[in-house]
Every structure is written in structure tokens, then in C-alpha cells.
Amino acid sequence: MLGSLQFSEACLRTYAHPELLKVAESINGPDFTPFNEALFIKEPGIGAAVSWHQDGVTHWESEDFDEDIHGFNFMAQVYGSTAVNGVWVLPGTHKIGKIDIKKLTKDSGGERLKGCVPIICNPGDVVICNRQLLHGSFPNCGYERRITVNFGFHKRSSVLGVKGGGVHSASQIFNSVVIERRSRVLGYAIEARKQRFPEEESYKYQPFNDTKKIFKWNENSRKDLKDYNLDDLSI
């Protein structure tokens, strides 16, 4: 389910967790930008496989390529995740560029790639997954469902002035107007969380501080979030 923050206030409040946003700042800088939000639901017995892949379509040949240029995702696990229903990754592959997955699969003798490991979590755990990391999942043949509250962030330099990849939203040039419009979800989320947890110290997002932008969380705010994900900063 894409654009999940417009459908679930629980997801919206999770999105604004101050400790998670501090991590986003430490990785992508204080002017980091949103990427995309989704709910991934993998039911027991019917949850399909997702082939090995690397996320990101835009910067693989960039002169400025580095291991963080396509951003990262937080993966918050509602029920936890296991080797049966969870995501598997091949550690270190986010650092080496685009991978020949067909050759890697052939060299490994099948889809169980040599060196791959599962992401195993307890309920409530949050994983950080680099989007360039080779990852995938197998059919959920077990008895436990997996629900992942997924949301990602970019370095501003990775998206400003860049033409989107057209995967999560229609391709467009991500100018400052688009980025500001897409970032409003952060303002609403922070305010929604503040209403729910008034004693908690809220995260201060630098771009809002610089522009003195003020948000309120109310019924009009909910309406303003409708289809916000059409501006997903998909690279």
C-alpha cells in the first residue's frame, strides 16, 4: 500500500518518531528529504516472493556515485520478521554499484545466494536498509504474517534538480517547489505525533526552521494529505 501516511495515523506518528528522524539527519544531513512510504503485507501461505533486486534507477552512472546516493528505508516491523517471511540481503553490496544478478545467481547455483542473510526482528524493531543493498524475499511458507511500515529518506543533493525515475510516481523534475510540497508530510506528521505524545520532545526539521513554516494537524490537514505520494521523490 503506497502513500500509507494518508490512511493511518499510527503510521504517520511512527514516521515522525524523533529518534528515527535524528538518524535520518545523521545519514543524509539536516536538510534531508522524504522519499516514499508504504505498508508491506506478507500473509502466511500466500505472500509471494520478491526477486533479488537493488532499488534506485537514477544515479548508478553518476560521477558523484556513493553508497548513500539512492537513500535508505526504515522498516518498522509490526509483528517482527523471520527467515521465512522476512527480507533477505547480501551484506556490503550497497557499496559496489550495479550488480549482475543473473550471473550472481548462476554462480551461487540458485536463488539462495552465497552469503545472503535474513533480517530477523522482534515486534516493534526498526531496520535501516540501504536502497542499493541487494535484497529480496522468498514465498511466505510459514504461519506468521509480516507487516512492515516502510518509509525512506534522501540526501537533498540526490534529488534537487534531478528528473525522477518514474517508478513510485510520474517522472518530473524535482525542483525546490516539488521538494517543499512533498516535505509537508513531515510537518503534519510531527504535529500529529506531538498531539499524541505531548511530553515528548519533537524533532525540529531544519528546512521548516529556516523558512519559519508552521503546520497544524487537524481535519484540513488530513484532506491536504490526499494523494501526497504523487510527488514521491523516486530516484
Model-found features: residue ranges?
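Non-heme Fe(II)/2-oxoglutarate
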Residues: 133-134, 138-235
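Short, surface-exposed loop/helix-turn segments at secondary-structure junctions
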Residues: 54-57, 102-115, 164-172
